[in-house]
């Protein structure tokens, strides 16, 4: 009798875990100092005023305010935080 042995399992069925990259706070949203604004690989968005750049290129707020995205003449998009004028107590 002609029989064919089992061929083994498929070589597919693996995938990497998603990294949850992207914009976390959009333009006009209020942020607190330390809030993450963008998670990225490389500098798709560049740091502007009142933001910091982490070693993994994460852009985060250094002051309280609202997020703004601006594209300059060089074609780069800069992320800034416009500080809110706090009322004197």
UniProtKB/Swiss-Prot annotation:
Q: Which UniProt keywords apply?
A: Ribonucleoprotein, Ribosomal protein
Q: Where is this region: Disordered?
A: 1-21
Q: Does the keyword Ribonucleoprotein apply?
A: yes
GO cellular component term of the entry, any = cytosolic large ribosomal subunit
Q: A Gene Ontology biological process annotation?
A: translation
Q: Which domain of life is it from?
A: Bacteria
Q: Which GO terms describe its molecular function?
A: structural constituent of ribosome
Pfam families per UniProt: Ribosomal_L27
Query: Matching HAMAP family, A to Z?
Result: Ribosomal_bL27 (MF_00539)
Tell me its family. Answer: Belongs to the bacterial ribosomal protein bL27 family.
**NCBIfam families, per this entry?**
L27 (TIGR00062)
Query: What PANTHER family does the record point to?
Result: LARGE RIBOSOMAL SUBUNIT PROTEIN BL27M (PTHR15893:SF0), RIBOSOMAL PROTEIN L27 (PTHR15893)
Q: This chain belongs to which protein, by name? A: Large ribosomal subunit protein bL27
Taxonomic lineage is: Bacteria, Pseudomonadati, Pseudomonadota, Alphaproteobacteria, Hyphomicrobiales
Gene, per the UniProt record:
rpmA
């Amino acid at each position: 009798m002609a029989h064919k042995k089992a061929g083994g399992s498929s070589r597919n069925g693996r995938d990497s875990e998603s990294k949850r990259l992207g914009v976390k706070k959009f333009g006009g949203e209020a942020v607190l100092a330390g809030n993450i604004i963008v998670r990225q690989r490389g500098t798709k968005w560049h740091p502007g005023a009142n933001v910091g750049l982490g070693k993994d290129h994460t852009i985060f707020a250094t002051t309280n305010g609202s997020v703004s995205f601006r594209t300059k003449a060089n074609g780069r998009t800069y992320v800034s935080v416009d500080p809110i004028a706090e009322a004197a107590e």
